[in-house]
Amino acid sequence: EETMPLTEYFRTEGSGSLQFKAAMSEYTIDKLAELMITESDNSATNMLMTRVGSMVDVNQAIRDWGLKNTEVQTWLPDYAGTNHTTAREMGRMLYNIDENDKFLTQESRAKILNYMGHVHNNRLIHAGLGAGAVFLHKTGDIGTMLGDAGIVIAPNGKKYIVVILANRPHNAIEGKDFIVHASELIYNYMVK
């Protein structure tokens, strides 16, 4: 299985545990994907982006996935907010991961969904869901933007995709509160 070394070039601040690991530690592509999703690990994300190629290559892959308004312009962390996307495109991406056999292999889709079921931050959309709901998701936080996007599976079997992105003053708690409240309203409507 292919591995990548954690060099100082990739080590970055912000989210994730890789920033604290020994230089030249080797990580499989799968482990990097797991850390990118479950911890929002910026170092793992940057390593995987270079595995795809240049920023041009990363953005071409994004276009190939049918995402026209999503663009990566800089490495993570991107506190300036130069990378951008839309809630609609995140929803489309989630649909493709969950349902589209032409998007990724079944094995890759299963791995991604498994990782999404083990995200460490469950204080956003997940906090607004009813008891027994399963949530497969990915969070993002750059201080002035807070987001959560995922697939909800209610105890009654209803399934839906939800994406909530909140602009906010830097690290303001109101962004989190908004996402939790919106999640609760959506959940109560969807599981009727």
Predicted feature descriptions by range:
Residues E8-K21, N114-I125:
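Short, mixed-charge aromatic SLiMs
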Residues A33, T45-N100:
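Mid-domain, small-residue-enriched loop/turn segments at the edges of structured enzyme/sensor domains
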Residues E1-R11, M55-N59, T105-S108:
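Short, well-structured active-site flanking segments
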Residues T28-L32, E39-A44, Q73-D78, A131, ...:
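Flexible glycine/proline-enriched surface loops and loop-helix/loop-strand junctions
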Residues T12-M47, M55:
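Conserved catalytic neighborhood of penicillin-recognizing serine enzymes
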Residues Y9, I37-S40, R51-V52, L67, ...:
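Active-site-proximal beta-strand/loop segments in catalytic clefts of secreted hydrolases
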Residues R51, D98-R123, G132, T139-K192:
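Structured C-terminal helix/loop/strand segments within mature extracytoplasmic catalytic/sensor domains
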